[in-house]
Structure formats: structure tokens, C-alpha cells
Amino acid sequence: MEEYFNKTGYLFSGNAVFVEELYRQYLANPNSVDQTWQEFFADIKDNNVVLNKSTAKVISTNVTNKELLNNNLSSETLNNLKAKEMISAYRRNAHYLANLDPLGLEIRKTKNDLKLNIEAFGLDSSQLGENINIMDEFIGTWNCKLSELVTKLDKVYTSSIGVEFDQIENVEEKNWLYTKLETDITFTSEEKKSILNDLVEVECFEQFLHIKFPGAKRFSIEGGDASIVAMNKAIDLSMHQGVEEIVIGMAHRGRLNTLTKVVGKPYKEVIASFINGNIFPDGLNVSGDVKYHLGYSADRVRANQKIHLSLADNPSHLEAINSIVAGKVRAKQDIFVDTKRSKIKAILVHGDAAFCGQGVVAESLSMSPLTAYNVGGILHFVINNQLGFTANAADTRASRYSTEFAKIISAPILHVNGDDIEAVLKATDIAVEYRQKFSKDVVVEIICYRKYGHNEGDEPMYTQSKMYNIIKSKPTPGSIYANELVKNGIIDNNYYAKLKEKFKIRLDQEYEQAKSYKQETHFFEGYWKGISRIRGKDAITGVNKKILQDLGTKLCEIPKDFAINPKLIRLFEVRKTTLTTDQPIDWATAEQLAFAHLLCSGINIRLTGQDSARGTFSHRHSILHNQIDDTTYIPLNNLSKTQAKYEVANSNLSEYAALGFEYGYSLANPKNLVLWEAQFGDFANGAQIIFDQFISSSATKWLRMSGLVVLLPHAFEGQGPEHSSARLERFLQLAAEENMYITYPTTPASIFHLLRRQILESTRKPLIVMSPKSLLRHKYAVSKLDELGENTTFIPILDEVTKIDTNNVTKVILCSGKVYYDLFAMRTNNSNIVIIRLEQLYPFEKKLVASLLKKYNKAQAFIWCQEEPKNMGAWHYIATHLNDALKEAEINNEFKYVGREESASPAVGSLQVHNKQQEKLLMEALGDDIIKEKLY
């Protein structure tokens, strides 16, 4: 190849990328390139030379491109080649020249810095009048003077929009984007006036609140006004494209304007929350939340077209809402069978510091193209006000842009100056159309500023005096645009002031109405109609035994031409025999039967998690894989022609975003059973924000209910500190106001009833399950089919299973989970110790526990036994409840703790030490009634 470079100077340095691209084009279609290039490339092929920039030897030289050009090419062809290279270079790098900072603080690079001056391409000023004539499937069609080409490129790529499309691998997408960007967009005079009116309403509402409620936190959008107008534009464009619903997720910055101007919440309702502080009607007995965390839903109607808009409730934990919105959108798409994912879409609004600082952004983006999580692309707006509270951009990222994460999914990124509203709307137009056409994520970063501090009571001059001295005297985006319209003769000098005055009058009227406004509820509507906030009677969750046997048998029938793994053949044979001969069933079978009957009752089920399709412990096998080809078979989707859908999928290696997605999915329809399973319960704390800010508290903060099921494998089995504990204590600490169910079931019957209760009861509450590991195959951890049969239900507390004379009972042990089977196995046959299991820890059923304890009122000792260290597990939560139950049972005694000592780590790393600890707690719990021969 070096020989060819030596002979052909035009293949050096700056031309290399172009020539390589041209060569690929030639390989696809030789006639698509100039005759000269055809001859050259043919020669390369004949000599078996491979043109590949990853392997080609780089040759350095000090001579200029002009000196290297081969004289065999005509000057016109050479100029066209150079121009094509210049166009490509502008497309790749000119975003560094774009005027993106409305404050003018950025020191911009020059054309010389980026080698975008014409001399860098072997051209000079004497050639500016020469014609350029390019027809190329990658570059497009250009027929103009060189000077006009330079002017056009400067206008498109170095004005108020800078683009990064080079990370996109799909050539069609990339060419489409460049063509759209290089095509002028025009607004009529009326459209320009409408844009100005939008800016006025955004600006005036913020100023109105600032004057009426000085010092009140509202997290103003002033300085980033264009983002609200852009969202409005995106919604209108989407409506015209046939989108019927949009779910929006955003943080607190600009939220009040989004609620009113974008989503359609009455101004008086927002103002009333400032006046009286109420966000919900009296008497609901909920905690509520601050006004800039609240969501809202409404319909927007334009010219006989309607679109439903929802702004999701969210906490101050930035970017936490991302995957939740995606999950909610996916659920709605599934409800309406929007398989093209074109009718329902998501808009996410980010802050610059958060977008590049919060890891959940990368988690959520990575999920976006995956089959189980794809929503047809999300439109992202990044409001870059160049600060993160008090931190400068240089403190929060190393790159120029805050949007680098988006490149991991090859998303197009458009950076735009927030003071150029028409440029913002052009970028929005391109982004909306791209998402709808290609069904992929797209990012619009609006570079703007923040008029006040992080909130209106904060003083930014302490830390950003230079920036805020500029901001103090800076005209608003609305006034900048108004002056532009005056200059162009579209409005007169008084038009802008009149618009502001007119809108202020409206806000004054809204303010007066707000004084007497009574907050209304907009909850439990649509699919949630009929769902109760309060627990009703226990649902009967049992199913006719014959029906269960038939369903179980059907699940074991695999098509004859499907090459199933031989080990699974045996599993299904045993399972089928167990069912048909009415033998006790294991956990996996009970779960499958619960799913099967729900599916045949029209209930859709979605189960995701790391390795959930097979199951971490190889117990589920929801998806069977053909051993000959790549086909799969899902027994739960082959029960009946009229059944509902069972969707099971392995998630990406994420807890935070993955759990958030399923929580969001559960919000859309209470008639879906939605489950997320951790690989091990220990890893659930990677999603702690979802548990703390959403699952445990959304009902009392926002009146948003969820029936999500969370399966967390938990048990102390000598596997070390990261494979033992789902941190049960943390969930119990979150438990209050009957906000969720926390269970540690020990029988297949329990999980069967728990799963069915989630759908059959009148309310919806999250279900946290400390699910089994070794118990999946434990010989005693089985249930009779009668325990799942008609008129049966979930039993939160299980009494002693052996017959013991209550008058002879000396000790009562209460426990939860796997330790029960250890105690049961180690207890002597003639023991006077009873072992009682709490299958449900929260809500604590005090009356049931008390009535059971009363049976054993002659016992001298009452023990709570757990595997977890004393500072973990259920002890600190349950001790008071147990002693209260003793009082209610009129037993003058107290529960004593038996378990591991306090520890900073959940479990030891040594199996030998684990066994000694387990032996100690069993001996302490059982005393002389232990079978010593069975000790470790």
C-alpha cells in the first residue's frame, strides 16, 4: 500500500477518510464513482491491496495537499473532491465552531484550529468564484460557487446549532439528518408571533410567581425559556404525526411552567398551592409533596386532533424518573398493541450536570434498544444552564458537552443556543421527525443559563460572579426575539409589551380565583377506576384442583419436533407425574400454576430480571431453547388461544434502571401482573432510590399506586456477604401506613396465593418477597395441591405442623424463611417446642399472631429466631409488635432474640465459620431438644 500512496499524493492525510469512503462506495457499485477512481480502485484490487484505515500504514510528510495532488486529475474533479472532503469535515467537526453559549463565556475554536479553512483542503481564496458540482449519495447534491458553499456550511454548521452525528453507524440515518439540517426551515409571520407569545407566557408566569411569592422555591426556567417552547413544539409536531399520547419525565427546573404551559394544568391550581400549600383535598390523610415534584395529566386538542399528555411525578433524585417513564410508555404501547411504537412516546427533560453525572442515565440509555425495553426511541431535551447548583461545568465533566453518554447508543445529538429560538425549534423539528421515522433516541441540548441561583433563595454571586454579572444585564429570550421581529418589520415596538400586559391580566384573574380554589383529585381514573386505596377483605385466591392439574399438565407438554435439553425432559416428566398423582409440588410448579391460571383469566404477566427467564438457580425455565437451532418455546404462552400474554425477559446488568422500568410499567394498568427479580437479593440495593423514593412512598406522596412484585433471593447459606442478604431490615424500615407487603414465604402455597392476591384483591400495593434459594429444591419445602385449591387463601402466619399437646409446650419459636427448615430438621421428635412461621412480616397481623400465641400461653419461653445479624433482619422491627401481641394474648412474657450477633457485614466469607454460627443459633434456640448428631 505504501507504494500506492507514494504514487498518489491525493491519498495523503486529510483525504484519507474521503478516499476510504469512496472505495467502499466503489465496491458496492463501481459505476457510482468517477472513471478515474474506477481505474485506480481496479488497480488496487488487481494487486490485492486492501484499503483500510485500521491497517493501512500512516505516511507522514511535510508537503501540502496541493503539492501532492496528482496532475492526471482535472482541476474541476480535484476541486469537487476537495469540496466533498470539506463538507465531510464540516459535518464532523464544525460543531466546535458553533455559537452555542448565549452568555458568550466560551472561548471558541477557530477554523485554523480545526483545519476547516479552505487552505486545509488544498484550496485558496483565488478559487472562491469557481463552480462546485457534486452529486454523491453520501454528500448529497451541491451545485454552487465555492464561496457559496463555504457560506452555506458556515451558516448551517457554525451558527446556533452544532451537531454530532458521526457516532451513527447507519448511513441512511446519517444522510437523512445532514439533509434535514442543511435544509432551511422558515416560519411565517403568524408563526413567529405565536413563538413570541409562547416565550411571553413562559417569562411572565415565572415573573408573576417571583413577585407574588418572593423567596418561594419554584426552580424557575428563566434563561432556559426556549425549552418550554421546544416541548410545546415537539408535542404539536407529534400530534400531526399521529402520536396519541406522550409521557413526560423531568426534574424540578421549569416544572411549574411545564405543568401549565405544556401539559395544561390550570394556572389557578398551581397558584393555589402557593397560597394555601395544599396539593390534595382535605381528608385524604396523605403526606403529599412539594409542588415542583407533582405530575399531571390532560388532553390537548388542536384542530380536531387530540393528544393525551402526562407529566410523571418524581422526587428530587435527578434522572431517577428516566426508566420509569420508559416503562410506563412501554406498558401503554402494549395495552394499545402499538407494535410500531409510533402512537405513544416519551419525552425526557434532563439537566446538564445530571445527564453526565448520574449513572442511571447510562443504564437507561443502554436499555433503550433492547427488545424487552424498546419504546421506539425517546426524545431527550437537555437543559444546559452551564451550572450544577454551585458547580461550574468544568467541575462536573471533562468534555465540552454534557451529552457524551448518548453516544453509547449512537443517538444523534443537536446542540443549540437557547437564545436563538428559531434554531431551537429547527433542532426540535429534526429530532421529533427522526424519532418517528427511525424509532430511536435523539438528543437536543439547549445551552442556556439560569437567571437566579439553584433556587430563588440562593445567592449565585458567591461562586459565579462573572457569569451572573453578565446575566444581570442580559435581555430575556423573549425580548431578544421581540427585537428581532421588530427589526424584520413583523411587529411594532409596542407589540411585545402589550402581549406581556395581556397575559399579566389573565394571571391576575387566575390569582383571584386561586384564593377560593378547592383542590381536586385526578386519580384512580381510566384503568385505575374501581381500585381502592384501602385494603379490603382477603381475596380468595385458590383454584379448583382439577383445573390446576390440567394447567400443569399442559405446561409439561412440549412439541414433539422441539429438541429440548435432556435434563429438562426429566424435569417436566417428574413435574407432570407429581401433578397427575396429586403429590406435593415445589416452588417453581406453584409459581407456574399461579401464572397459568392468571393468564387464562385474561391477566397479562411481565417478568424481568437478570437471568429470570431460566432463573438464577435454574428452577423456572420459562423459555425453552431448542438444542439444534435458535428457536424457543414458552409453555406459558401455549395454554390457550384466548389466553393473555406472558412476557419474560432477561434484563441488562442493571438494578436501578431495570427496576425503575418495571415500576413504571406497573403504573399503567393495575390488571397486569408485573414482576422484577433480582439475581440475588443482595444486589437490590443498587436500586435503592427506586425503593425509597417510589415503591415505598408514591402512594402517600402522589396518590400513585403500584402492584409491582419484587422477588429477592435471600437466605444465609454460606455464600458470603454479597450472596446472603436482600437487606430485609431496610424494607421493614420503609414499611408504614400499609404502603406495601413484605413477605418471607416458606411454602409453594404461600407464593401461589401471594402472586394471585396481587391481582385479585381490591387494592394495589407493592409486594416484596424474600424468595428462596436452596428451598427451591428442599424436600420439605413443598405444598399439597389442596393448599392451592378452592376457597383457600394466603395465610400470613403458619402454626406448628406436628401434633403437640398445647399444655406441654415449654417454648415457642417464631421465625421467618429458611431458618424454619433448619430448626424443624434439628428438633427432636418428642420435643415440646413449637415453631411458628411468619410468612408476612408487614403488615403485621397482630390479632392473628395474638390468637395463635394464646394457644401456647403456658409456655415459659418465647423466642424470635433469625439467621441475620441482630442489627439486621426483622428483629428491630418486629420485637415491639411481638411483645404487643403477647400483651393482647394476656401472656406476661417477652420475646427473646436468638440469632447472629451484630455485624457490619451481612455474612461471613468462610463456609466453616458460617456453619459454626448456624450451629450456635440453632443450639441456642432449641436447647436440649436439638438432634446433636445432625449438627454441622
UniProtKB/Swiss-Prot annotation:
InterPro entries: 2-oxogl_dehyd_N, 2oxoglutarate_DH_E1, DH_E1, KGD_C_sf, ODO-1/KGD_C, THDP-binding, Transketolase-like_Pyr-bd. Its EC number is 1.2.4.2. Its cofactor is thiamine diphosphate. It comes from the Bacteria. Homodimer. Part of the 2-oxoglutarate dehydrogenase (OGDH) complex composed of E1 (2-oxoglutarate dehydrogenase), E2 (dihydrolipoamide succinyltransferase) and E3 (dihydrolipoamide dehydrogenase); the complex contains multiple copies of the three enzymatic components (E1, E2 and E3). NCBIfam families: 2oxo_dh_E1, PRK09404.1, PRK12270.1. Coiled coil: none annotated. GO terms for cellular component: cytosol; oxoglutarate dehydrogenase complex. The keyword Oxidoreductase applies. It comes from Rickettsia prowazekii (strain Madrid E). Keywords: Glycolysis, Oxidoreductase, Thiamine pyrophosphate. This is 2-oxoglutarate dehydrogenase E1 component. CDD domains: TPP_E1_OGDC_like. The keyword Oxidoreductase applies. It catalyses: N(6)-[(R)-lipoyl]-L-lysyl-[protein] + 2-oxoglutarate + H(+) = N(6)-[(R)-S(8)-succinyldihydrolipoyl]-L-lysyl-[protein] + CO2. E1 component of the 2-oxoglutarate dehydrogenase (OGDH) complex which catalyzes the decarboxylation of 2-oxoglutarate, the first step in the conversion of 2-oxoglutarate to succinyl-CoA and CO(2). PANTHER family: 2-OXOADIPATE DEHYDROGENASE COMPLEX COMPONENT E1 (PTHR23152:SF4), 2-OXOGLUTARATE DEHYDROGENASE (PTHR23152). GO terms for biological process: glycolytic process; tricarboxylic acid cycle.
